[in-house]
Amino acid sequence: MPKRKKQNQHQPPTQQQPPLPEREETGDEEDGSPIGPPSLLGPPPMANGKPGDPKSALHRGPPGSRGPLIPPLLSLPPPPWGRGPIRRGLGPRSSPYGRGWWGVNAEPPFPGPGHGGPTRGSFHKEQRNPRRLKSWSLIKNTCPPKDDPQVMEDKSDRPVCRHFAKKGHCRYEDLCAFYHPGVNGPPL
């Protein structure tokens, strides 16, 4: 008899839930949940505090929880959108200095130690030079030098330039898409 008293003293108080049948550790239960340490798998599936409920597959937490919970070991921290030390490529504000002329991230105006170097400097030179050459070739082809004899395109079939009609000159001169009477076609 004294042995029984010791066992009763160490047992936790009984709960009002019905006793559950002993589980075998095969993993072939009705709900198909694997057997493992409860700390890694989380609490057993329960819905409204009733084990074995058909809705229990939707809830992996205490009663009243909303949606499935991910165990802490498998969850990832949220991405640092504009916060923290990692700033490149994560969202709209990827550089503290904004975007440069060509849409790339601009570097600080005077890079300190560790910000410059031959790799980054040569990258920007390689990226900018072809664009400069392209833009120069476009300007050279569309705007011939003043010394060359200019061949005027006849634009008399186009509408008259409003600015030229009012002021007698146009700021776009030869590049204007409209008709300048007496300049790029016969006078009216």
Swiss-Prot record:
Gene3D superfamilies: Zinc finger, CCCH-type. One of its GO terms (molecular function) is zinc ion binding. It comes from the Eukaryota. A zinc finger (C3H1-type) spans 155-183. Residues 1-157 are annotated as: Disordered. Residues 83-96 have a biased composition (Low complexity). Pfam families: zf-CCCH. Residues 145-157 have a biased composition (Basic and acidic residues). InterPro entries: PRR3, Znf_CCCH, Znf_CCCH_sf. Residues 35-46, 69-82 have a biased composition (Pro residues). Keywords: Metal-binding, Zinc, Zinc-finger. This is Proline-rich protein 3. The lineage of its organism: Eukaryota, Metazoa, Chordata, Craniata, Vertebrata.
